[in-house]
Regions:
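Terminal low-complexity tails and localization/encapsulation signals of metabolic enzymes
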Residues: 1-33, 67, 71, 121-146
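Histidine- and aromatic-rich ligand-binding microenvironments
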Residues: 5-6, 21, 30, 34-44, ...
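Alpha-helix N-cap/helix-start motif
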Residues: 15, 42, 80, 98, ...
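Short connector loops/turns at beta-strand edges and beta->alpha or beta->beta junctions
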Residues: 25-27, 47, 163
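Residue-level signal for inorganic ion chemistry
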Residues: 28, 65, 87, 109, ...
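Glycine-rich loop-to-alpha-helix module at the N-terminal edge of alpha/beta enzyme cores
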Residues: 31-119
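Rossmann-like NAD(P) dinucleotide-binding subdomain of oxidoreductase/dehydrogenase enzymes
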Residues: 121-226
Length: 226
């Protein structure tokens, strides 16, 4: 099957000239064909993610964020066996290890459910004559997650729920060796009610990574190499 990008809540097929085979390492069988993003496509995705963030998630109340996070957590718990099967088929680890990986990611999603209530600023009264000081916490905007081959579900789940809980839009670039688990998890976010464009998945190689690293509208990057 064709493994596409997920952009603005919709599967998005890239150029036919930019693809890569995906294999089951246990059998050597080709299991899919992965679309690879060009630098131009990455730029378009970041721009659209920023627009979605400005129009929706940046303005979302803490209650709205929490509702999406709790619903995502429930969906992830219900579907973790399905996601584990995708990991096993493309990564090669045994199913029990794959389920353990998703469970570790689920723990972070559970933690993130409480973050909106922890995003408190500070206030200090009369720090100087007739001067009060206060601080507030604000989202950054578009952030990127570049995840490795060895934990295709757990590593993105370390970062994405926290970034979304804090009000950011996210662009994920999974490993091109085992991309399907990230697509499956991203679909759960949409089902949980996250606005389109707040979570995007772009598949690719060095060209896509370089485009994310150098884009001026990407305000933070989470990277784990392997």
């Amino acid at each position: 099957p064709r493994i596409t990008h997920l952009i603005g809540g919709t599967p998005w097929q890239g150029s036919a000239a930019r693809t890569s085979p995906v294999f089951n390492p246990a059998t050597g069988e080709q299991t899919g064909v992965l679309d690879l993003a060009s630098s131009e496509l990455v730029g378009e995705v970041v721009t659209s993610a920023k627009a979605a963030w400005e129009s929706s998630w940046q303005r979302a109340s803490l209650t709205q964020r929490t509702q999406a996070l709790f619903r995502f957590r429930e969906l992830l718990n219900e579907r973790k066996a399905e996601i584990a099967e995708l990991i096993t088929a493309e990564h090669g680890k045994v199913v029990s290890d794959a389920i353990g990986e998703v469970t570790r990611g689920l723990e972070v999603a559970e933690f993130a459910c409480g973050i909106p209530h922890l995003l408190k600023g500070g206030f200090s009264e009369n720090v100087s004559t007739k001067v009060d000081v206060y601080s507030i916490r604000q989202s950054l905007g578009v952030v990127a997650v570049i995840s490795p081959f060895n934990f295709p579900a757990m590593v993105p789940l370390w970062f994405v729920p926290v970034a979304i809980a804090c009000g950011n839009a996210v662009v994920i670039k999974p490993s091109e060796k085992d991309p399907s688990a990230v697509n499956a998890v991203a679909a759960l976010w949409k089902e949980a009610g996250l606005p389109d464009g707040i979570l995007n998945v772009v598949h690719g190689d060095k060209e896509a990574v370089d485009a994310l690293l150098t884009h001026p509208d990407v305000k933070a990057i989470s990277f784990v190499g392997s």
